[in-house]
Swiss-Prot record:
Catalyses which reaction(s): 2 D-alanine + ATP = D-alanyl-D-alanine + ADP + phosphate + H(+)
Residues the record lists as binding Mg(2+) 2: E318, N320
Localization: Cytoplasm
A GO term from the CC aspect: cytosol
Organism of origin: Bradyrhizobium sp. (strain ORS 278)
The UniProt record lists the keyword Ligase: yes
Protein name: D-alanine--D-alanine ligase
GO biological process: cell wall organization; peptidoglycan biosynthetic process; regulation of cell shape
GO molecular function terms listed in the Swiss-Prot or TrEMBL record: ATP binding; D-alanine-D-alanine ligase activity; metal ion binding
EC id: 6.3.2.4
UniProt cross-references to NCBIfam families, sorted A to Z: D_ala_D_alaTIGR, PRK01966.1-4
Occurrences of domain ATP-grasp (ranges): 145-351
Length: 367
């Protein structure tokens, strides 16, 4: 690794319905990484999956980074320890690049689910975030909930279905013990494709919507009214795992729940409270449970754990291993409330990536 600035490549965009959220998250991370400490390269992933050099079309003033439609394509070399080629399609020889750390700012399938993490493992380069197993386990809400249930952690009752194995409204309602249901894609975040249903007609429409985004969908009991409480978890370079201050999301009555529109298109879609006003004993239980969830799903580096709280009842809702870093995102806000501003948070994430990669390289690969 260079003795000067640490070479960091920010990977953003991606083949996911959360492509635009990734672009906004990446813009904030780009601004938060100290240019005096890090040499930054921007790599956008197009909707069709091409990795494209994006430095020329972006700067630190962008609200959301741009993924260029064309430009030099980036090829990360297997076992290259961060070496890459920029290929511009001309007869000229490819330009050689090198990175110490990859920062994947990717949300949803083909980015947060272990696929990109697998490519980075094969490239033998340090990277921010969970590894393949933790990323994949947390991404699939069905698998995650089963692992959490087996670990003795409280979850909301649910069933799953696919287009090939449909479930009727009556059977789903009977299975989870409620006529009011949430239907959601199993492998997507940012509330994309989620619906609240109260009868068979709404349920059928909700299933069709969710199946547009995923081959497997989750059907959960609606336990409203609840408070939506979140906790950020961070693993430091030495392996210590810490939980942040808590945050609360209060969706506007006009939305009914924290939908995609409430998050990203309606400025008044929800009120965000950091720190959340929670009884100290309940807050302590939530923070402890967040670190237990982190361990049960084999998470590393960072995660945001979302809870439903009703009185003294606490349920794990879901886990995001690459949480949003937009200007409204809770993960950086909760750490800031805990005394860790975003630039320092970036330093912690990069330091963990480098330390983990060094530890992994010490493991024997031959007998």
């Amino acid at each position: 690794m260079t003795s000067e600035r640490i070479r960091v490549a920010i990977l953003f965009g991606g083949r996911s319905a959360e492509h635009d959220v990734s672009r906004a998250s990446a813009a904030n991370i780009f601004r938060s990484l100290d240019a005096g400490r890090y040499a930054l390269t921007l790599i956008g992933i197009t909707h069709d999956g091409r990795w494209v050099l994006a430095d020329a079309v972006n700067d630190a003033t962008s609200a959301a980074l741009i993924v260029p439609a064309d430009g030099p394509q980036i090829v990360l070399l297997p076992a290259g320890r961060g070496r890459a080629l920029a290929i511009d399609g001309s007869a000229a020889a490819p330009r050689e690049l090198a990175f110490d750390v990859i920062f994947p700012v990717l949300h949803g399938p083909n980015g947060e689910d272990g696929t990109v993490q697998g490519a980075l493992e094969l490239a033998d380069v340090a990277y921010v975030g969970g590894r393949v197993l933790g990323s994949a386990a947390a991404m699939d809400k069905d698998v995650a909930k089963r692992l959490l249930r087996d670990a003795g952690l409280p979850i909301v009752p649910f069933v799953t279905m696919t287009a090939a194995s449909p479930v009727s409204y009556d059977d789903a309602a009977r299975a989870v013990g409620s006529s009011e249901l949430f239907v959601k894609p199993a492998n997507l975040g940012s509330s994309v494709g989620i619906s609240k249903t109260r009868d068979a007609a709404e349920f059928e429409a909700a299933c069709q919507l969710a199946l547009r985004f995923d081959r497997k969908i989750l059907i959960e009991r609606c336990i409203a009214p609840v408070r939506e409480i979140e906790c950020a978890v961070l693993e430091h370079a030495d392996g210590q795992i810490k939980a942040s201050e808590l945050g609360e999301i209060v969706p506007a009555n006009s939305h009914g729940f924290y939908s995609y529109e409430a998050k990203y298109t309606d400025a008044n879609g929800a009120a965000l409270h950091v720190p959340a006003q929670v009884e100290p004993a309940v807050a302590q239980r939530i923070r402890k449970m967040a670190t237990e969830v982190f361990g049960a799903l084999c998470c590393e580096s960072l995660a945001r754990v979302d809870f439903f709280v009703r009185g003294d009842e606490i349920y794990v809702n879901e886990v995001n291993t690459l949480p949003g870093f937009t200007n409204i995102s809770m993960y950086p806000k909760m750490w800031e409330a805990a005394g860790l501003p975003q630039p320092a948070l970036m330093d912690e994430l990069v330091a963990h990536a480098l330390a983990r990669h060094a530890r992994l390289r010490e493991l024997a690969s031959q007998r």
